[in-house]
């Protein structure tokens, strides 16, 4: 297959904003507060442009220390953001979130990069950082959903063990839906990107299977570890509600 990636000109890229402008117009017409949406889009553009330059620098330097530093920063950011859905102080649960993502995310990242892919060098930036980002982001989402649902169930008076099970089930809904839909409803990002880059669909499928297993495993482990480790903190909160 042709391995040359088609370059997107800025003029052509601007066409991608047409549906975005349509949604902004709808939000404005319905008095939903369009400024937040515009800010989010602007922030997305700035963040992606910055990460483009940062990744270019990282890939060129090819330093294991820089890769590890970036992964640690991503892990800490994911841990902090994951706690925004709970009313408890983030500082109270931050170590639990970090611990959960390390066990669920870092271990799975190492298994995939060193076992499945057998990277050489082991810290290859073009693999470690994108895969780490995927894993940490999904761990973040699963913990966030689990924390929000756990607190909600405890407020309703459910015992912790029952609330924990409901919270874990809730946290796995998005990734479970993704497993059911992949190949039927959607072609996930990595697979689509590889096919567009000219990689054989059969090879792209193998990578996507790895990614789906990696996301499901890391999300489930992180959420389960988090729910197990925060029992004391949330039990105290439950007692205040009673």
What spans do the regions from the language model cover?
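Alpha-helical transmembrane segments of helical membrane proteins, especially in multi-pass transport
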Residues: 138-148, 152, 161-193, 222
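Glycine-rich helix-loop "coupling/hinge" segments at transmembrane-helix boundaries
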Residues: 185-211, 215
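N-terminal transmembrane hairpin
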Residues: 2-119
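Membrane-proximal helix-loop-helix units in multi-pass membrane proteins
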Residues: 110-159
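Membrane-spanning helices that line or support transport/gating and their immediate boundary helices
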Residues: 37, 41, 142-149, 153, ...
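Hydrophobic alpha-helical transmembrane segments of membrane transport and translocation systems
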Residues: 214-242
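Juxtamembrane helix-boundary/capping and inter-helix hinge elements in multi-pass membrane proteins
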Residues: 30-32, 152-161, 196-202
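Pore-lining and gate-forming transmembrane alpha-helices of multi-pass membrane transport proteins
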Residues: 129-133, 203-224
